[in-house]
Amino acid sequence: MDNRIHQTAEEFLSWVEIAPYVPDSSGSHVVVQDPKDPIIPEPTEPDQYVDLWYAMMNYNRDIYLKGQQDLDCEYAYEKPSFKMKDYGLESEVFAVITIPSMELEMPIYLGATYQHMADGAAQLSQTSIPMGGTNTNAVIAGHRGWGGASYFRYIDQLQPGDEVIITNLWEELHYEVSEIQIIQPNEVEKILIQPGRELITLLTCHPYASGGRQRYLVICERIPYEPDSEFNHP
């Protein structure tokens, strides 16, 4: 299985540690998703790229409050909500997605442009930016193979309980596969933000080599990061 990644993703992983996540020592920023669930901290102000962090947090809040009004326009998916270079970053890679069970790492770009999709995975504009927080659903699209790399080719091997990791500019977010869906391309409601939840949704064409007749969704819910758990990875 060829799971090569774009070089910028490797560079991203090599320097992302210089921009650590800064936890809230007061413990005041938390959300209880369910009385039975562990408490997951809400995002708190980091010490790197603060202006970008606030702008993106406001973007996530605004699209939720406005009901993602432009999500039914396919051209809206492509237009990047932010350009990293406008905030002093040399690369347009915002994050890296790691799927241990698939031995896969891919860069994540903002906006599903032709070039971004050729270079890796892409967040669909008008969906949440993958940086955590309640009332978010970052939809991350990938081809089922491109230019000799597999990308999301084997995404149908994922099962409920498998882990998906997002490493962005500020922190490492851990998610667990909770649901698999096969939908029609016009079923936009299936990728909307779900109030009170903290999700990412992986999206690709289905069936493989079908010309995109349907969409394959892998819905993942945020889980606490426990370094000593079975999910911990090198």
List each model region and its residues.
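Solvent-exposed, non-transmembrane regions of membrane-associated and secreted proteins
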Residues: 1-159, 163-234
